[in-house]
Curated annotation (Swiss-Prot):
One of its GO terms (cellular component) is cytosol. This is Bifunctional protein HldE. Homodimer. It comes from Bradyrhizobium sp. (strain ORS 278). Pathway: Nucleotide-sugar biosynthesis; ADP-L-glycero-beta-D-manno-heptose biosynthesis; ADP-L-glycero-beta-D-manno-heptose from D-glycero-beta-D-manno-heptose 7-phosphate: step 1/4; Nucleotide-sugar biosynthesis; ADP-L-glycero-beta-D-manno-heptose biosynthesis; ADP-L-glycero-beta-D-manno-heptose from D-glycero-beta-D-manno-heptose 7-phosphate: step 3/4. One of its GO terms (biological process) is ADP-L-glycero-beta-D-manno-heptose biosynthetic process.
Length: 490
């Protein structure tokens, strides 16, 4: 049985050595509404731009996003783009990078001009020298890579045919990895699969597979038949053919092919989706996953990646939301573990134009009065964040005999309510820190308060928000329920 949480935790303990062609990906977003008077060419009115680590560097980003450790070796020029990539890689937690500088070539850089409204790529400009590295650079790459194999659980080679993975580099790395008793995953570019001989798994896309096998294989059976000669030629354990909306088919040397369908998803941008697939596959296999489980996780990751703009990485939390049934994960996913996750979730809602509300309390024993406040609060906004007093905070406020239920139990009860979208536990006596972080459009409080008495009202009103006071429901209180229960026991 596929246990996502166990596999995800195992992935976080792995180290993946990633070697390949590093690129600087730039995206220029705008709209086209006219043709240039100077030439029959569209004019893009630029609205924004962004820069990402691309190519094999995006593979490393995805490895780190899963919680695993990535060691990355790549090649850049002696230029500003190379400096920028080195700086960007240094910012990513979980990636240790070793970059070899080649003054004879520019750092590979790709600039894409994209229609913001339609997410359509209109033009791409490339700066590159797609030639094999010189013997001197090859030796520097090999010298950098080989000592790192001992520190890795698996080796991943991402070939974009930009010069890093020459025949000599491939041979040295694959042979050394096999001698160490470890797997090598290769995302190939060359149609000559023999140069990857000895790799454990090759992951060509449909076009690359057709060129390598000189076939027009479409069905699972045709792919399996065409792959057999390729497996023999490359002396590999298996070939995984990725097929975009058709899913992916794994053909092992021994055993039956395995086909995993693609998740239905609205595609925004396919840039870097293959990087995501191979990163997840390598990390899952390093963690000891069965083929089916690794493929299921990789397919889900691809679906998440193509639903994002630009060169995207995919986190373990995003995978969890994609893979696990909604009823299983809905409640527990509402419970926020840290401020960073809370800020990210709220930022996503705001980017979607949603109105965020906030309320707080101990919620020790949930009663109709609580439900009234929470329901009214949710009616006043699009997404409701509930600040929940921690156990230590409740003790300070209510006494040593409280809470009756620990903070996790109270959080799970709140998270199960349809009115609640997120639960954030705070240890302080007041939720001011959370309010400053969330900056809600509406701050809701139940009880006999004036607006000025509500903690955080200054923060909310200064940002243009409002404070909403809800009348309490008479005859319902946790303290009364606790006292009644204790008197009944006497």
């Amino acid at each position: 049985m596929f246990d996502f949480d166990d596999l995800s935790q195992a992935i976080a303990r792995q180290t993946v050595l990633c070697v390949g062609d590093l690129m600087l990906d730039e995206f220029v977003y705008g709209e086209v509404s006219r043709i240039s008077p100077e030439a029959p060419a569209p004019v893009i009115a630029v609205q924004r731009s962004e820069t990402n680590i691309g190519g094999a560097g995006n593979v490393a980003r995805n490895i780190a996003a899963l919680g695993a450790r990535g060691i990355f070796v790549g090649l850049v020029g002696q230029d500003a783009a190379g400096d920028q990539l080195e700086a960007e890689l240094a910012k990513v937690d979980g990636i240790e990078s070793v970059l070899v500088r080649d003054p004879s070539r520019p750092t590979t850089r790709k600039v894409r001009f994209v229609s913001e409204h339609f997410s359509t790529h209109m033009l791409r400009a490339d700066w590159e020298r797609a030639a094999p590295a010189s013997e001197d650079i090859e030796q520097k790459l090999i010298a950098a890579i080989l000592p790192l194999i001992a520190r890795a659980d698996i080796v991943l080679l991402s070939d974009y045919a930009k010069g890093v993975l020459t025949a000599r580099v491939l041979r040295n790395v694959i042979d050394a990895t096999r001698r160490a008793g470890k797997r090598v995953i290769v995302d190939p570019k060359s149609a000559n699969l023999a140069i990857y001989r000895g790799a454990s798994v090759l992951t060509p896309n449909r076009k690359e597979f057709s060129e390598a096998t000189r076939s027009r294989a479409e069905t699972e059976q045709e792919i399996a038949a065409a792959a057999q000669d390729a497996i023999y030629l490359a002396d590999c354990e298996a070939i995984l053919v990725t097929q975009s909306e058709r899913g992916m088919t794994l053909v092992p040397r021994q055993g039956d092919p395995i086909h995993v369908p693609a998740y239905p998803v609205k595609v925004r941008d396919v840039s870097g989706a293959g990087d995501t697939v191979v990163a997840v596959l390598a990390a899952a296999l390093a963690a000891g996953a069965a083929w089916e489980d690794a493929l299921r996780m990789a397919s889900a990751a691809a679906a998440v990646a193509v639903s994002k703009q630009g060169t995207a990485s995919v986190t373990s939390a995003e995978l969890r939301r994609k893979i696990l049934p909604h009823a299983y994960r809905a409640a527990e996913e509402k419970i926020i573990e840290n401020d960073g996750e809370l800020a990210t979730r709220v930022a996503v809602w705001r980017s979607e134009g949603l109105r965020v509300g906030f309320t707080n309390g101990c919620f020790d024993i949930l009663h109709p009065g609580h439900v009234k406040v929470l329901t009214a609060a949710r009616a006043a906004c699009d997404r409701l964040v509930v600040g929940l007093n921690s156990d230590t905070s409740v003790k300070r406020l209510k006494g040593e005999s409280r809470p009756v239920q620990d903070e996790r139990a109270r959080a799970e009860v709140l998270a199960a309510l349809e009115a609640v979208d997120l639960v954030a536990i705070f240890t302080e006596e007041t939720p001011l820190r959370l309010i400053e972080l969330v900056r809600p459009s509406v701050l809701v409080k139940g009880g006999d308060y004036t607006r000025e008495q509500v903690v955080g009202h200054e923060v909310v009103e200064a940002a243009g928000g409002e404070v909403l006071l809800i009348d309490i429901l008479k005859g319902h209180s946790t303290t009364a329920l606790v006292d009644r229960a204790r008197s009944d026991q006497r």
